[in-house]
Amino acid sequence: LREEKMPALSRTLFDEYEINGNRLRYEAVYFKRREFLSAFGLASIIWHKKEDIQKLEYVIGEICSEGCWALSAHVKRLEDPNWRMTIDLTASETGHTLAQMYALLQDELSEETKELIKTEVSRRILIPFMKAKAPAYCWEDATNNWNAVCCGNIGSTAIFLLEDGAEKEKLLSRIRYAIETYYLEGFGADGACTEGLGYWGYGFMNMVVFAMDQRALDPTYDLTAFEKTEKIAHFQEKCYFAHGRTISFSEGSGKGKYPMGLTCCLADLYRDIRFPDPVYARGFTGDRCWNWNELYTGWRWTKQYLEDVENGIVEAPKPLAGAEVEFLPDAEWCILRGEHNTAV
């Protein structure tokens, strides 16, 4: 990427969804730009090379100059005069990505870049959210992955950028309420995600990222200590079989790639988490959206877990269980696994 030119977004591409329903051409460029942001952000955090920092600052400037951080398919330009401030999955992710880079690279980013991040993230994410009366957004009281992704990213963004005080606590209290009351209640007591395994990983990862950030800020509030959270954490291992085959109910795929960073974090938290075969973990280039949370935690949480294993703090990774029958009464799923992890 160091020698590659960052592609430009255009009004023509953005308009295509309204004109002919095509969202993919715009998104291809949008996510390529997020590849630049995530790749140079992670490289800067790991290696601290001047050339990467300089390229990252250029990329941040480009991201902050975008007219709208939301995807074209998620805005309503004819109905909403403030459509450029739409907060969707990718807008909240972009805000959090920039906020975390601000926090982790404070001593290396220029004052100009840091001020740009604070200004744009506040203008596009934090201020609109704080001004709107809850539940102001369709995802704020949703029981699906949108709630966890948007609320989790906004919460983490506030932790990184807002000064401690009443304003920050009011926002975080609103986020905690939304996640507890709606997202977690979208799961039954059996912890199954009826949206499918892929959306389990997407939503739950973002919730856990916020939970860990919130716990670091205030150890007295710990979403990961909830009994239901632990039940949800075990869902992935119930859905994997031999050769990477997975349960394909709902929007799930018949073959999946799992988030290693999230799995390692859960193994650090709950001890009895089981790992699918590592060959089926999603690699650095496995996510077309270049989601910052997955890429950063894929490095950070995996590294932390391996260090904890080496130091005897936690047990070594456990493989999937052998032959067993798993009944998830709330989802009404019965899962049968053969002796060699084959689906029955």
Protein language model regions, located:
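Carbohydrate-active enzyme catalytic cores, enriched for enzymes
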Residues: F204-V344
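Short, functionally important structural connectors and interaction interfaces within domains
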Residues: M6-L9, E185, L320-A323
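Low-complexity, Ser/Thr/Pro/Gly-enriched N-terminal "stalk/linker" regions
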Residues: L1-E18
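Exposed boundary/loop context
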Residues: F14, L184, A189-G191, N291, ...
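Low-complexity, intrinsically disordered regions enriched in charged/polar residues
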Residues: P7-R11, G95, E115, T119, ...
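Aromatic-lined, polymer-binding surfaces characteristic
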Residues: E27-Y240, T246
